[in-house]
Amino acid sequence: MDIFRLDILRHGETELSHTLRGSTDDALTAKGWQHMQQTIETELSLYGVSSQPLWDVIVSSELQRCRLFAFELSEKLMLPLQVNPQFQEMHFGDWEAVDTQQIYAQSPELLTQFWEKPTQFAPPNAETMQQFQQRVVFGLDSLIQQAQEHQWQRVLLISHGGVIKLLKCLALQQPLDDILKMSAELGQLNSFIIHSSNKIRLMEQNK
C-alpha cells in the first residue's frame, strides 16, 4: 500500500557549481533561484486550481541553497516547513569547494577510484558513502513515520543531487557504486512513491 508521494526538488545553480560543494554552504545564483521557481510553477500549473494545496508539507536541507528557497515557498503557499540536516549533501572532506580539474591534477588516481567505486574510496577526511546512505535513510525513515502520523499524501523535499541519486539507487535496486551514474539535474523535480513496507519506487517519468 502506498503511503505518500515524495517530490524532491534539487537546488538550482549555485555560486560554486563548478566545484564539489557538499557541505559547503554556498548561495544560489539568480539563475538557480529562477530555475527552481519555474519548476515549481510548472508543477503547480499541471495540478490546476484546487482548494487543497498540492503538498502537505515542505521539508528542506539546512544548507542555504535549499533552505532559503524553501522558506520563501512555504510562506507563499502557506505550508509548514521542516528543516532536516539528514537530507544535506554528502560531505567531501578535503575536496570541499575544490574544482574537479584541480583535484584530478593533484590526485588523479584517487579521483578516478572515487568515481568508479565510491563505496570503497572516499576523499580525504570525507563522509563515506556508507555513512551518507545511513544518514539519508535515517532521515527518510523519520519522514515516513511523520507521514503516517499526520496522513500526509504528498511531500516536497528540497535537497541535493547526492540525495536524489542515492534514493534512485535504492528505488531501482542498483548497487550503491552506481550512484554517480544516476541523473539529478539542477533545479528539477524527481518523484518517488513510498510504500507502507518502507519500500521506495521511482515514478516512471524520472527513470
Model-derived features: positions:
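Conserved histidine-centered catalytic loops in small-molecule metabolism enzymes
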Residues: 2, 50-86, 112, 193-207
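Short, hydrophobic/glycine-enriched beta-strand segments
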Residues: 5-11, 157-158
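Active-site-proximal alpha-helix that buttresses catalytic centers in soluble enzyme cores
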Residues: 9-79
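Generic structural signal for well-ordered alpha-helical scaffold segments
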Residues: 37-48, 133, 137-148
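Short beta-strand scaffold positions
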Residues: 60-61, 134, 158-159
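Active-site-adjacent alpha-helix immediately C-terminal to a catalytic or transition-state-stabilizing loop
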Residues: 67, 138-203
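Phosphate-handling substructures
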Residues: 75-137
